[in-house]
């Protein structure tokens, strides 16, 4: 059986985390040549490339499996040895989360864990359709995703759903939709998307108004909080989680443009199995709060 030296695995992990050999060397306090040598040793052991040497580097399929193994071992080591050998070093937990969860329910869910446990969070923000891929690549140990099926050697639990409403300010609604939300009016109304892969707004308009993707003018803004600000100041209409704008809807700063029509995104919590003690705490906290504030039906 091929058993890797975990120093070489840590070099591979550092290159991926730091997005390059030079910064990985600085992180590990060794030379760049030493990083390259360790990864070469690992590749010789397994007889195949473990890195695609692009900018930034990315792991091959076998590299992803090894990184996942490393992260599982680190968590299990913490469970068995952490209190005795590394009590002064907070455990690093890398999680992939979507921006809307981060802006709404996720941080309150993690609050009791952050207060009671010595951990450092590395929250990697990604669209909920792509967070599971970061878990597959071994970049994180847990992910909030819309995928309901677990990866091999992983666990999954349902968290609940975010319901997205199509909203705008009253002044925006009066300007662009004086006769209600119609197909022709939507073609003139500025909207906003998180990035070029964010298809929620387009999917909503296609499903309910038969508008083809790309037919509506759309800003690109990588911030959930900015969506709310843009809508409040009357510059765009957009899809925002109901949970994020309850106050604005109640005081009429924002209005639901299409009552009864919404987009529902069911969210699931994925993580490696077996769970360490610390990851079990994270899981319990996320499920407890998620089941409380997210839609369960």
UniProtKB/Swiss-Prot annotation:
DNA-binding positions are: 21-40
CDD domains recorded: PBP2_IciA_ArgP
Disulfide bond entries: none
Family matches, as InterPro entries? ArgP (IPR017685), ArgP_gammaproteobact (IPR023490), LTTR (IPR050176), LysR_subst-bd (IPR005119), Tscrpt_reg_HTH_LysR (IPR000847), WH-like_DNA-bd_sf (IPR036388), WH_DNA-bd_sf (IPR036390)
Q: Where is the HTH lysR-type domain?
A: 4-60
User: Which keywords are on file for this protein?
Assistant: DNA-binding, Transcription, Transcription regulation
- Its biological purpose: Controls the transcription of genes involved in arginine and lysine metabolism.
Could you give the subunit structure recorded for this chain? Homodimer.
NCBIfam families attached here?
Answer: argP, PRK03635.1, PRK13348.1
Family affiliation? Belongs to the LysR transcriptional regulatory family.
> Would you tell me the protein name for this molecule?
HTH-type transcriptional regulator ArgP
Source organism per entry reads: Pectobacterium carotovorum subsp. carotovorum (strain PC1)
């Amino acid at each position: 059986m091929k058993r890797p030296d975990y120093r070489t695995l840590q070099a591979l992990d550092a290159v991926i985390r730091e997005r390059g050999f030079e910064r990985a060397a600085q992180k590990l306090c060794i030379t760049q040549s030493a990083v390259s040598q360790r990864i070469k040793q690992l590749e010789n052991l397994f007889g195949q490339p473990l890195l695609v040497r692009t900018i930034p580097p990315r792991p091959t399929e076998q590299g992803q499996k090894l990184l996942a193994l490393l992260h599982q071992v680190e968590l299990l080591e913490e469970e068995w040895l952490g209190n005795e050998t590394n009590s002064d070093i907070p455990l690093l937990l890398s999680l992939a989360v979507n921006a809307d969860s981060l802006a709404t329910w996720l941080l309150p869910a993690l609050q009791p864990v952050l207060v009671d446990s010595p951990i450092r969070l590395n929250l990697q923000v990604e669209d909920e359709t792509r967070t599971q891929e970061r878990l597959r690549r071994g970049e994180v140990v847990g992910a909030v995703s819309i995928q309901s099926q677990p990866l091999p050697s992983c666990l999954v639990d349902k968290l609940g759903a975010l319901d997205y409403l199509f909203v705008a300010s009253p002044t925006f609604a009066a300007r662009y939709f004086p006769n209600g939300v119609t197909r022709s009016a939507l073609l003139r109304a500025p909207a906003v998307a998180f990035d070029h892969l964010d298809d929620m707004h387009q999917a909503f308009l296609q499903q309910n108004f038969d508008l083809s993707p790309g037919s509506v003018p759309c800003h690109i803004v990588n911030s959930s909080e900015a969506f709310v600000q843009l809508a409040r100041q009357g510059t765009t209409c957009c899809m925002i989680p109901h949970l994020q704008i309850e106050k604005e809807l109640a005081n009429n700063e924002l209005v639901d443009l299409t009552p009864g029509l919404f987009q529902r995104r069911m969210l699931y919590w994925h993580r490696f199995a077996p769970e360490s003690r610390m990851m079990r705490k994270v899981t319990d906290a996320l499920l407890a709060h998620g089941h409380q504030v997210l839609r369960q039906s």
